[in-house]
Amino acid sequence: MTAPMMEGADATISESDALAGSAPLIRRPLDLSGRAVLLATDGSPCALAAARVAHALATQHHAVVHVVSVVDTRGAPIPPPLDAALALTDAIGGSELHREQERAVRAELSGAVGETITWPMRVVLGTPSAAIAREAKHVGAALIVVGLRRHGRMDRVMHDETTLNVMRTAACPVLGIVAEQGALPKRILAAVDFGDGSLVAVRAGRAVAGSNPTLVLTYVDSRDGSFVAQGEATIHGLGLQAGFAKLAHDVGEDGITFDHVVLHRAPSQSVGQALLEYADEAGCDLITAGSVHRGRVDRWIVGSVSTELVRDGRRSVLIVPPRHQG
């Protein structure tokens, strides 16, 4: 099941792309070196795990970490004039309250990573998902890192799905980290359909991986397994093998091991369930998914799978949004 590692011509970003920062992700890998990574924290166990992952991204991949902590104003009955005044105070960052909050957040994160951090930090007011997306745009983030916990029906009723909403609105990849994870992933399940989005997601997974990672290219076959003739099954299998080989070639660089697997799901089983079950069986510590398509049907399909992966909350998830630009 292991595909050979191959070297590819895309292993590094060209100088012009690095300077411009605007080349489509399908043409260049995601490289975090020297680029902003936004860590969103609320002090929860999963957010502190995300802080440890962000610290590892800075240490091992030379990312430049920025921090945002959002004071959620949704549940506070703040009159519009006062809300505007607080927002102005937030924007100028001059209040002692903000400075005290920043000191508290910095101390909390320093305790989580085991050393004093000097990352740029902002405490802002607003709806968490919208504020995080705005801050990511403000700092030019190549990646957002957030904590990820399990979401139930009550969370949806109360509109308390910050991580999922960030993934739906952000213009860059979003890495959701579960509380049990404190290091960069080493065995990554990359959900693929062999489209351009698959290459984007696999490359993004590589960009956040630890040293000598294994990328498990995973295709979920929605057919029931029956074929008109045996030859049709052979042709289908050969096509899948060619697709896996091409992805490995396009992403390949030194230090990566590629595995691949085809999952056959029962009619009653969703794509997300099949991916999660295999991730548990194979010991994968990250699931990646993504698309660069923007049609209505594509958004619905990709959105439903991503939503299920995020709401389940038992595996860290990297979602690459349907955008053409990195």
Functional labels for PLM-detected ranges:
Residues 143-165, 184-185, 286-312, 322-326:
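Glycine-rich, Arg-bearing micro-motifs that act as flexible, cationic patches
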Residues 86-103, 234-243:
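A short acidic, glycine-rich active-site loop
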Residues 7-9, 18-19, 24-90, 116, ...:
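Small/aliphatic-rich secondary-structure junction motif
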Residues 55, 107-110, 164, 203, ...:
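Active-site phosphate/pyrophosphate- and oxyanion-stabilizing loops and adjacent acidic/basic residues
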Residues 161-180:
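Short, structured interface segments
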Residues 66-68, 120-124, 175, 216-218, ...:
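General small-molecule cofactor/ligand-binding pocket signal
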Residues 1-33, 46, 53, 72-75, ...:
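Structural beta-alpha unit
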